[in-house]
Amino acid sequence: MSSLDNDKTENFIQERLDSLHEIDCKVVTLLDQFSSIFQSFYTKSKEDFSQQTSDIYSTLSKVAIDLRKEIKIMDDNIGAYDKNDDNVMILPISNVDQKNTKLGRKRLDLELAELKRLISDEKQVETLENESNNEIQPKTESDTNQVETNENGNDINNKESEDIEMKE
């Protein structure tokens, strides 16, 4: 391979590296913007907050577009050497789509167990709150209008009904 071919290869690769470096810098800027918006949320005016939010969305959009472009360039150059000026071919890798599913499944199971525990704790708290609300209820106007009765259906507060029961 001649030095001219080596320079061409380095050009394509260097362009990809430079492009990824720019994307990385934009991601760092995005993180910095997030940090500043959280720090200044309570202290600055609404105009500043909306401007910072707009800047975040703008940077995020630029990062997404640049990443899509790089992915397209990589996809176009897989298995084809004539897609770029430097005749660089990216070899296909068949194992790229495989993920560590065991670790992901274990993490998912742990998260689901934690959620179930939290939900059951919430339900217990709700039932305790409902029970405590049922035990102590302030009298309402409708409660004061109700007449208390004994097992015979007679008014407890009415003395005449007691006298009738005693005579029987």
Swiss-Prot record:
Manganese among keywords: no
Gene3D superfamilies, sorted: 1.10.287.3490
Localization of this protein: Nucleus
Region (Disordered): 126-168
Lineage top rank: taxon: Eukaryota
Biased composition (Polar residues): 130-156
Compositional bias annotation for Basic and acidic residues: 157-168
GO molecular function: transcription coregulator activity
GO cellular component: mediator complex
GO biological process, one term: regulation of transcription by RNA polymerase II
Keywords (A to Z) from UniProt: Activator, Nucleus, Transcription, Transcription regulation
Role played: Component of the Mediator complex, a coactivator involved in the regulated transcription of nearly all RNA polymerase II-dependent genes. Mediator functions as a bridge to convey information from gene-specific regulatory proteins to the basal RNA polymerase II transcription machinery. Mediator is recruited to promoters by direct interactions with regulatory proteins and serves as a scaffold for the assembly of a functional pre-initiation complex with RNA polymerase II and the general transcription factors.
Subunit structure, as described in the record: Component of the Mediator complex.
UniProt family annotation: Belongs to the Mediator complex subunit 11 family.
Listed name of the protein: Mediator of RNA polymerase II transcription subunit 11
